[in-house]
């Protein structure tokens, strides 16, 4: 019809033609109301700086747990030693404030509190000797060992610094002046052996006590051997340390832990106690509270895994295959 224009939809051989029409009808740019809704639904974007901080926190979380665990250990342990010994001076306190049992309880409480703080995050080693033993016998990654040990020693330094700052005036009175520092107060933070102890006896005492500690730690974390729940493990360690202090603690002040001795000793060296800290008994600081505990922990782990442990994650494997495993092996 010439006077009318009739619009008819012609089929197109191009399959994209309909698509292009739909695209024109529904543009990609959302309406303003739709865009506002999307903004509310989108999660807030974090700045790159905050993301970096979160990454750093995640990377150092386990070592920091070890740091705080050892710091608490020193605060309770060295703090109790300071209170007991310094109070024997009548110019510091009117009466004695405690006994060896008080010091023993202080260290036991310190190990329990340190384990509670760090146990669920880093495993609660708070001891380089235990960290190395766990890497040897329980598959703890060796790549994490250096960061753990560094954090543990640093925790010992900071813990000793806090206790020293708290008792500095009492230490001044006890020593006779601000610039007088002797073994009498150094022994409140670092370990020293009794005068009659020979070098071999000192080494053996620390070796034996740490071997017992290591064996008990492996037993307390062995699910096949009636291990306590995670919440009760620190209490078990508390009881263990009371026993170790009461039985093996007198002669060398039972370091059992390189970070417990070396960390505070480093702080004392920075606080004016001099070279005597490291010259005492031909480098006693190295072979008694560091080497002996490390070797003792290895010996304790070796004994436990050789004669008692029945798990699969030890280099010493004694577990017999079950009947099902034997049948599977025969089929294969």
UniProtKB/Swiss-Prot annotation:
Family: Belongs to the MIP/aquaporin (TC 1.A.8) family.
Mode of membrane association: Multi-pass membrane protein
Protein name as catalogued: Aquaporin-7-1
UniProt keyword GTP-binding present: no
Extracellular side: 88-100, 166-199, 252-283
GO cellular component: plasma membrane
Subcellular location: Membrane
Pfam families: MIP
Sequence motif NPA 2, residues: 257-259
GO MF: glycerol channel activity; water channel activity
Induction, per UniProt: Expression is up-regulated during development of the basidiocarp. Expression is positively correlated with root abscisic acid (ABA) content during ectomycorrhizal interaction with poplar trees.
Keywords: Membrane, Repeat, Transmembrane, Transmembrane helix, Transport
Function: Water channel required to facilitate the transport of water across membranes. Does not mediate the transport carbon dioxide across the membrane.
Organism for this UniProt entry: Laccaria bicolor
Reactions it catalyzes: H2O(in) = H2O(out)
């Amino acid at each position: 019809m010439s006077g009318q224009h009739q619009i008819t939809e012609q089929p197109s051989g191009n399959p994209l033609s309909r698509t292009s029409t739909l695209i024109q009808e529904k543009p990609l740019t959302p309406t303003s109301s739709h865009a506002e809704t999307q903004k509310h639904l989108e999660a807030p974007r974090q700045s790159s700086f905050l993301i970096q901080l979160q990454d750093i926190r995640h990377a150092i979380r386990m070592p920091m747990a070890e740091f705080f665990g050892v710091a608490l250990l020193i605060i309770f342990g060295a703090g109790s030693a300071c209170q007991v010994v310094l109070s024997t001076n009548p110019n510091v306190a009117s009466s004695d404030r405690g006994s060896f049992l008080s010091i023993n309880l202080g260290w036991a409480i310190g190990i329990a509190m340190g384990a509670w703080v760090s146990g669920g995050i880093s495993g609660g080693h708070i001891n380089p000797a235990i960290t190395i033993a766990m890497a040897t016998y329980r598959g703890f990654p060796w790549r994490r060992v250096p960061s753990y040990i560094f954090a543990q020693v640093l925790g010992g330094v900071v813990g000793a610094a806090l206790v020293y700052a708290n008792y500095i005036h009492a230490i001044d009175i006890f020593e006779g002046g601000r610039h007088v520092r002797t073994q009498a107060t150094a022994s409140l933070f670092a370990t020293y052996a009794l005068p009659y102890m020979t070098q071999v006896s000192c080494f053996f005492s620390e070796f034996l006590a740490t071997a017992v500690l290591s064996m008990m730690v492996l037993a307390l974390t062995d699910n096949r051997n009636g291990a306590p729940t995670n919440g009760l493990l620190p209490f078990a360690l508390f009881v263990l340390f009371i026993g170790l202090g009461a039985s093996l603690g007198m002669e060398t002040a039972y370091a059992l832990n390189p970070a417990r001795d070396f960390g505070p000793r480093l702080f004392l060296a920075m606080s004016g106690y001099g070279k005597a800290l490291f010259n005492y008994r031909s480098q006693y600081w190295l072979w008694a509270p560091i080497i002996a505990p490390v070797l003792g922990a290895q010996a304790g782990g070796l004994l436990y895994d050789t004669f008692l442990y029945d798990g699969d994650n030890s280099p010493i494997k004694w577990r017999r295959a079950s009947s099902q495993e034997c049948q599977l092996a025969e089929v294969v």
